[in-house]
UniProtKB/Swiss-Prot annotation:
Region of interest: Dimerization of protease: 514-518, 562-568, 601-613
CCHC-type Zn finger ranges: 389-406, 410-427
Organism: Human immunodeficiency virus type 2 subtype A (isolate ROD) (HIV-2)
Biased amino acid composition, Basic and acidic residues: 473-485
Region (Interaction with human PPIA/CYPA and NUP153): 191-228
The protein's name in its UniProt record: Gag-Pol polyprotein
Gene that encodes it: gag-pol
Bias (Low complexity): 456-469
Intervals of motif Nuclear export signal: 16-22
Length: 1464
């Protein structure tokens, strides 16, 4: 510190404090800036003593000046500070830092010529002379010479690494020290680092990767002329295969210089940043202030982590402004928010200096006392005198008691009293409030009879003075009273028992002592000499002080010091105090205090103490199923990264008591693995408990559904809280714990795996939900009984408390519940505690008088997939409980059939209209109301034109909830049946939510309802209801009879269809010899059956018996449909209405039943057969002649794609193997080419899908890597892209584009040198694009608009090429075809696992095996050698080919694999 203190003295120090940091700013230089600058000089190998003179500062500036343009912010701040110190030494008058810099520049140029302007680029440019800068390469006499790095520089680098251990400061330090260095110099710096070889290895790996990437991007152009300097390779840049002379020539040659030094520095910086992240794994988002942590300590940790973050300054600025306040503890956050927007760091540190734990408060108290007692502070640290040592033994200054040679004095060295030593001295105890004579006025104040002064720890008797024996006697009495506890409350809490010296006397052992929850301030009413006072019980205060009472004139004046300052008080002794019906006598002070406080002197006299109640949740006994044993599955291998993550998780859980180590006698094991969480930064441990779930006894879900806000009674106050770590708070029964054992393996089996068992409910185990629900019910049941007027709704870990109590009483109940849960080991996080509306609960927003759904925003998309529609329908169904009129019928029709989740959906006009109507409905906010038991509950049902039923459940005009019903299970339905289903749904819903049946308002006439209900009462359950008729439904009835009609004609109907040609027949035969057949086209089996039934109805009389063999037709007729979406069913309904009586019966098909057998033969002739078998031989001949492709064969001959592909695969001429022919363009589905072109002074970036010719383009502001990367991200978010081909432009080879390509998973390739056609597709498309723009240029003003218009024309208005399609159609067709091919290949791979043995003709010998190609209804396709044969099914045996058995473990123990015998 000597050099630092002597840098500036006297007037120079005063002059420093007049200079502003910034022009026009408020802040000025302080002595701390000099100290900081002296510390920083050591990093650059510069002595601190250089700051003491003008010449020394000039030497420092000579070293720092060349590094300023490319240096870090710390380097620039150091340079600025030295400039100011130089000006003070030179007696130059300056006002701010900028003025000092200008003067220094001017003087250095005039005197030494060394402060010339630095280059604006980061590429090293050697100065013009030896004195030109701190460069290893100097320009002397027109030649560049290399000067090795000085030992001082190397020493500074080594010291930086050793001190900071690869902290965040290493990267800017390396940048500053290696400025202008060659690869040789940089390697010399790396070789100086002796330790940290792991970090050095990481840097070497980065160098190897970057060198290989350099070689790929910069291929060797070819042979060079003799004497010409070769181009550098990656190893040359790394300095392993190049000399210093070659490196200097590459760096400073006139034509195309290659800054190998800067390139190598960038590689090293990438490696150093990786090491910094490894050595500093703490994320800045995890830096949070502890509850008692001083704010300054938290800020230090925050900025240390911030320096390790490799991000933009703008992002760091945002982190500083947002995260610093957001992650502070609640006390500091409250203080910081009061400072307004964007406070400075100095303001925040000043405001929060009083917030912290006891240690922080003690330090601040000491500082406050020092300012009051001690002499006035001297302005500068250099002028302050060191405090003299004083010996406690002899009283002399200059040495300590340990060094004292005088005889040892008996008694305490602190207070001088005998009977105890200094470590036990009561005067050493520090308190939050302390009394005693302070400052200069203290001797003038009246003193008490004791010469020892005020007692800071009053004894229970209230005496502030006395002998040592009395003090110890009182202390022992108090401690003994604290140790004697009594049993309190039914949860086993303990409370202190008072000592026997109180007026009231000792309490009985059977009584429970008072308890104070710490969720709010412990404030009680005390009576001081009969005067009531509200006081705070403060265990952190030594003494007691109150305001607003009069206790007479028998007092002693005292000064009390605290965080808030110092106040004058009156001290009264032996005052009678009554608290909670208990009386004591103690010392108390009165004064102007902001809050009345009872400190430890009164609390100990009352026998109070702090107690931590520990309650217990009894575990539930669980058994395995009879005859079952626990899982004994092997742990599969895991990656090293996952093993380390699991170890960290398990160690944390073991410390928290959730896991314990399994004994070696435990035979059970369950596989464990890890997955990344959503933020991709943390890991989640998963245990595969499927096998344990199989053998564990069954459980019943106690909670059958989710509570609904419409079922809540209307209450004045609501509070919502959450139970944290729900499962991990409940113990698992000890007898069951061994079955949960799992193992953490080690890499390469380096050590035995560590085994754990669960002590709490595991996640993923089937018993955890039921046990948690049962436990929560047991925990809350006594609380519910004790507070019957309070509503407590609990679903899993969400708890809602509602009551009509006053605010104080309601808050008290909530705090009691939190205390109960916390006492049982459950946590209730403050961040999820909701005290004020709106309350976010179970997806709802709750208010005291109403409830809403949380904000619903329907997405806006250009392209919708099946998964998007599913999510949309789910959101709309959720909204339908409050928003009347929500419809999803046509939206659901968009995803009918077998569709993949990612398949694009084609919208219909009806669906678009339905979605827009729903958007309008959701834009009008709706409110639901709470249930009032005394009012009538009503349900009104309505039906719209589209057969959708809506209902609302209300009390008078207040709607509780609404709903819709559109579950039409069949295409053909009956309105009365649907109405019954609606009533059933409402009835069940009302019973669950309110426990009562509402009064219904239904749109049907009573007579029609009762007529239908008499026949179909068994269809479903309908609750009792009061009938209120609204405008009725129209109901059509037809007379179906239950027995055959004697004398009526009987019709046997049947229909058939060929699946391939879609041709079919429908017909009937009668018992009177009539028959009729009708040919059908583009039909199905079901449609043919319905046609036959309709023909029978049309051709029969008023009474008829119809026999069908189709359950489909039978079901439709029996349900008496009144409406249908099918034209043929509507025709059947019309015909059935005309009949007087109809009897419909069903018989099984193909069973030889008379009538049915005849009509079956009638309609099956020429229809039910395999139509494509006879087309295989012509297809083979066609391919042998013309070598047609798969699509042509399938299209022309109507054979399946799989058969056509097998024909092509069997042709030797049509198979191409090996690599693609050199020079051909890669036309795979995911291949795109990208290039930039120019038009009208604008830059247009163009991307072309090679296979289809589809084009994407837009105008970008500059041809940079960032803009190119953004365009690539847009492209990849719209279309599948796996391979990107570009030229070698700087924007395409930039780090931004590489990073995007890596993140998306794109293979990137570049143009081949001397082959401009390697990206010829996009080059040609640039030409076509410009031609198209020229044709339509008049239609738009800006080039941005006309580019997009031209793209539309080229993608959608240009047909031709492959398939005679537009590029957009071709691209979509290719994507769809690729999906179909993948499906067929998967199907084909399954068929290849089977072998066929067959017989041909009359030959009884079995032949084969052959390869199964196709399995039809009547025959199979078999490949034998090169022949494809058609074998009838009756002459073929299909056997699975399992291959040869392998003598090895059949179970797969790889990560994620399933074991047939062990896992479901």
């Amino acid at each position: 510190m000597g050099a630092r203190n002597s840098v500036l003295r006297g007037k120079k120090a005063d002059e420093l404090e007049r200079i502003r940091l910034r022009p026009g700013g408020k802040k000025k230089y302080r002595l701390k800036h000099i100290v900081w600058a002296a510390n920083k000089l050591d990093r650059f190998g510069l002595a601190e003593s250089l700051l003491e003179s003008k010449e020394g500062c000039q030497k420092i500036l000579t070293v720092l000046d060349p590094m300023v343009p490319t240096g870090s912010e710390n380097l620039k701040s150091l340079f600025n500070t030295v400039c100011v110190i130089w000006c003070i030494h030179a007696e130059e008058k300056v006002k701010d830092t900028e003025g000092a810099k200008q003067i220094v520049r001017r003087h250095l140029v005039a005197e030494t010529g060394t402060a010339e302007k630095m280059p604006s680029t980061s590429r090293p440019t050697a100065p013009s002379s030896e004195k030109g800068g701190n460069y290893p390469v100097q320009h002397v006499g027109g030649n560049y010479t290399h000067i090795p790095l000085s030992p001082r520089t190397l020493n500074a680098w080594v010291k930086l690494v050793e001190e900071k251990k690869f902290g965040a400061e290493v990267v800017p330090g390396f940048q500053a020290l290696s400025e202008g260095c060659t690869p040789y110099d940089i390697n010399q710096m790396l070789n100086c680092v002796g330790d940290h070889q792991a970090a050095m290895q990481i840097i070497r790996e980065i160098i190897n990767e970057e060198a290989a990437e350099w070689d790929v991007q910069h291929p060797i152009p070819g042979p060079l002329p003799a004497g010409q300097l070769r181009e550098p390779r990656g190893s040359d840049i790394a300095g392993t295969t190049s000399t210093v002379e070659e490196q200097i020539q590459w760096m400073f040659r006139p034509q195309n210089p290659v800054p190998v030094g800067n390139i190598y520095r960038r590689w090293i910086q990438i490696g150093l940043q990786k090491c910094v992240r490894m050595y500093n794994p703490t994320n800045i988002l995890d830096i949070k202030q502890g509850p008692k942590e001083p704010f300054q300590s938290y800020v230090d940790r925050f900025y240390k982590s911030l320096r390790a973050e490799q991000t933009d300054p703008a992002v760091k600025n945002w982190m500083t402004q947002t995260l610093l306040v957001q992650n502070a503890n609640p006390d500091c956050k409250l203080v910081l928010k009061g400072l307004g927007m964007n406070p400075t760091l100095e303001e925040m540190l000043t405001a929060c200096q009083g917030v912290g734990g006891p240690g922080q408060k003690a330090r601040l108290m000491a500082e406050a006392l020092k300012e009051v007692i001690g002499p006035a502070p001297i302005p500068f640290a250099a002028a302050q005198q060191r405090k003299a040592f004083k010996c406690w033994n002899c009283g002399k200054e200059g040495h300590s008691a340990r060094q004292c040679r005088a005889p040892r004095r008996q008694g305490c060295w602190k207070c001088g009293k005998p009977g105890h030593i200094m470590t036990n001295c009561p005067d050493r105890q520090a308190g939050f409030l302390r009394t005693g004579p302070l400052g200069k006025e203290a001797p003038q104040l009246p003193r008490g009879p004791s010469s020892a002064g005020a007692d800071t720890n009053s004894t229970p008797s209230g005496s502030s003075s006395g002998s040592t024996g009395e003090i110890y006697a009182a202390r022992e009495k108090t401690e003994r009273a604290e140790r004697e506890t009594i049993q309190g409350s039914d949860r086993g809490l303990t409370a202190p028992r008072a000592g026997g010296d109180t007026i009231q006397g000792a309490t009985n052992r059977g009584l429970a002592a008072p308890q104070f929850s710490l969720w709010k301030r412990p404030v009680v009413t005390a009576y001081i000499e009969g005067q009531p006072v509200e006081v705070l019980l403060d265990t952190g205060a030594d003494d007691s002080i109150v305001a607003g009472i009069e206790l007479g004139n028998n007092y002693s004046p005292k000064i009390v010091g605290g965080i808030g300052g110092f106040i004058n008080t009156k001290e009264y002794k032996n005052v009678e105090i009554e608290v909670l019906n208990k009386k004591v006598r103690a010392t108390i002070m009165t004064g102007d205090t902001p809050i009345n406080i009872f400190g430890r002197n009164i609390l100990t006299a009352l026998g109070m103490s702090l107690n931590l109640p520990v309650a217990k949740v009894e575990p539930i006994k669980i058994m395995l199923k009879p005859g079952k044993d626990g899982p004994k599955l092997r742990q599969w291998p895991l990656t090293k990264e996952k093993i380390e993550a699991l170890k960290e998780i398990c160690e944390k859980m073991e410390k928290e008591g959730q896991l314990e180590e399994a004994p070696p006698t435990n035979p059970y094991n369950t596989p464990t693995f890890a997955i990344k969480k959503k933020d991709k930064n943390k890991w989640r441990m998963l245990i595969d408990f499927r096998e344990l779930n199989k053998v564990t006894q069954d459980f019943t879900e106690i909670q059958l559904g989710i509570p609904h806000p419409a079922g809540l009674a209307k209450k004045r106050r609501i509070t919502v809280l959450d139970v944290g770590d729900a499962y991990f708070s409940i113990p698992l029964h000890e007898d069951f714990r061994p079955y949960t054992a799992f193992t953490l393996p080690s890499v390469n089996n380096a050590e035995p795996g560590k085994r754990y068992i669960y002590k709490v409910l595991p996640q993923g185990w089937k018993g955890s939900p039921a046990i948690f629900q049962h436990t929560m019910r047991q925990v809350l049941e006594p609380f519910r009984k004790a507070n019957k007027d309070v509503i407590i709704i609990q679903y899993m870990d969400d708890i809602l408390i509602a009551s009509d109590r006053t605010d104080l009483e309601h808050d008290r109940v909530v705090l009691q519940l939190k205390e109960l849960l916390n006492g049982l080991g459950f946590s209730t996080p403050d961040e999820k505690f909701q005290k004020d509306p709106p309350y976010h609960w179970m997806g709802y927003e709750l208010w005291p008088t109403k409830w809403k759904l949380q904000k619903i925003q329907l997405p806006q998309k250009e392209i919708w997939t099946v998964n998007d529609i599913q999510k949309l329908v789910g959101v709309l169904n959720w909204a339908a409980q409050l928003y009347p009129g929500i419809k999803t019928k046509h939206l659901c029709r968009l995803i009918r059939g077998k569709m993949t989740l990612t398949e694009e959906v084609q919208w219909t006009e009806l669906a678009e209209a339905e979605l827009e109507e729903n958007r309008i409905i959701l834009s009008q906010e709706q409110e639901g109301h709470y249930y009032q038991e005394e009012k009538e509950l009503e349900a009104t049902v309505q039906k719209d034109q589209e057969n959708q039923w809506t209902y609302k459940i209300h009390q008078e005009e207040k709607i509780l909830k609404v709903g819709k019903y559109a579950k039409v299970k069949n295409t053909h339905t009956n309105g009365i049946r649907l109405l019954a289903q609606v009533v059933q749904k409402i009835g069940k819903e009302a019973l669950v939510i309110w426990g009562r049946i509402p009064k219904f308002h239904l749109p049907v006439e009573r007579e029609i309802w009762e007529q239908w209900w008499d026949n179909y009462w068994q269809v479903t359950w309908i609750p009792d209801w009061d009938f209120v008729s609204t405008p009725p439904l129209v109901r059509l009835a037809f007379n179906l009879v239950g027995d055959p009609i004697p004398g009526a004609e009987t019709f046997y109907t049947d229909g058939s269809c060929n699946r391939q040609s879609k041709e079919g027949k429908a017909g009937y035969v009668t018992d009177r010899g009539k028959d009729k057949v009708k040919k059908l086209e583009q039909t199905t089996n079901q449609q043919a059956e319905l046609e036959a039934f309709a023909m029978a109805l049309t051709d029969s009389g008023p009474k008829v018996n119809i026999i069908v063999d189709s359950q489909y037709v039978m079901g439709i007729s029996a349900s008496q449909p009144t409406e249908s979406e099918s034209k043929i069913v509507n025709q059947i309904i019309e015909e059935m209405i005309k009949k007087e009586a109809i009897y419909v019966a069903w018989v099984p098909a193909h069973k030889g039943i008379g009538g049915n057998q005849e009509v079956d033969h009638l309609v099956s002739q020429g229809i039910r057969q395999v139509l494509f078998l006879e087309k295989i031989e012509p297809a083979q001949e066609e391919h042998e002649k013309y070598h047609s492709n798969v699509k042509e064969l399938s299209h022309k001959f109507g054979i399946p794609n799989l058969v056509a592909r097998q024909i092509v695969n069997s042709c030797a001429q049509c198979q191409q193997k090996g690599e693609a022919i050199h020079g051909q363009v890669n036309a795979e589905l995911g291949t795109w080419q990208m290039d930039c072109t120019h038009l009208e002074g604008k830059i247009i970036i163009v991307a072309v899908h090679v296979a289809s010719g589809f084009i994407e383009a837009e105008v970008i502001p500059q041809e940079s890597g960032r803009q190119t990367a953004l365009f690539l991200l847009k492209l990849a978010s719209r279309w599948p892209i796996t391979h990107l081909h570009t030229d070698n432009g700087a924007n395409f080879t930039s780090q931004e584009v590489k990073m995007v390509a890596w993140w998306i998973g794109i293979e990137q390739s570049f143009g081949v040198p001397y082959n401009p056609q390697s990206q010829g597709v996009v080059e040609a498309m640039n030409h076509h694009l410009k031609n198209q723009i020229s044709r339509i240029r008049e239609q738009a003003n800006t080039i941005e608009t006309i580019v997009l218009m031209a793209i539309h024309c080229m993608n959608f208005k240009r047909r031709g090429g492959i398939g005679d399609m537009t590029p957009s159609e071709r691209l979509i067709n290719m994507i769809t075809t690729e999906q179909e091919i993948q499906f067929l290949q998967a199907k084909n791979s399954k068929l290849k696992d089977f072998r066929v043995y067959f017989r041909e003709g009359r030959d009884q010998l079995w032949k084969g095996p052959g390869e199964l190609l196709w399995k039809g209804e009547g025959a199979v396709l078999v490949k034998v050698g090169t022949d494809i044969k058609i074998i009838p099914r009756r002459k073929a045996k299909i056997i699975r080919d399992y291959g040869g058995r392998q003598e090895m473990d059949s179970g797969s123990h790889l990560e994620g694999a399933r074991e047939d015998g062990e896992m479901a």
